[in-house]
């Protein structure tokens, strides 16, 4: 609607929780740009997307900054395993964005590991188990930190 603030939608959760499944089935994503590090990584290096993960993450953060500077709404997928998205949220709010966070979680990391195994069998990308386990805990910790971030 006219006059509504731009919206930053953060779709968060640990590796293998179902972020991409959620966005693929969510009609709101078709109306705004979606910054998906996994899709960018695959585009950068189709045969070994894991090798371009850092470059993809950098590209997502740069694109997010551009959208925020222009006042354009967008969505972004993240594991929330780093602190960069907390700062992005603060920057977006400071520029008048409405920030919506959708967190997708599972009861235990083994569910995520099983989903990743299934994804690999289906031709998708793998994530090392040690990374999944580390990010699983960090994701929940950063979710809690982001939940108490100032809203003004």
Where is each model-derived feature located?
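The Walker A (P-loop) glycine that initiates the GxxxxGKT/S ATP-binding motif of P-loop NTPases
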Residues: 10-13, 78
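NTP-dependent small-molecule kinase module
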Residues: 145-152
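Glycine-rich phosphate-binding loop used to anchor ATP phosphates in small-molecule kinases
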Residues: 52-104, 136-139
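Conserved nucleotide-binding/hydrolysis micro-motifs of P-loop NTPases
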Residues: 39-41, 81, 105-111
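Conserved substrate/cofactor phosphate-moiety recognition/catalytic segment
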Residues: 20-72
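The conserved Walker
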Residues: 14-15, 20
């Amino acid at each position: 609607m006219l006059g509504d603030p731009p919206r930053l939608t953060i779709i968060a959760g640990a590796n293998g929780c179902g972020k991409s499944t959620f966005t693929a089935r969510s009609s709101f994503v078709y109306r705004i740009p979606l910054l998906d590090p996994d899709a960018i990584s695959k585009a950068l290096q189709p045969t070994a997307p894991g090798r371009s993960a850092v470059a993809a993450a950098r590209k997502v953060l740069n694109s997010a900054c551009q959208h925020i500077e222009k006042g354009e709404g967008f969505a972004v997928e993240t594991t929330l395993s780093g602190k960069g998205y907390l700062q992005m949220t603060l920057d977006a709010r400071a520029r008048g964005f409405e920030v919506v966070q959708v967190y997708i979680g599972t009861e235990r990391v083994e569910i995520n590991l099983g989903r990743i195994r299934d994804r690999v069998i289906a031709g998708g990308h793998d994530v090392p188990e040690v990374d999944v386990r580390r990010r699983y805990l960090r994701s929940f910790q950063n979710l809690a930190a982001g939940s108490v971030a100032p809203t003004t």
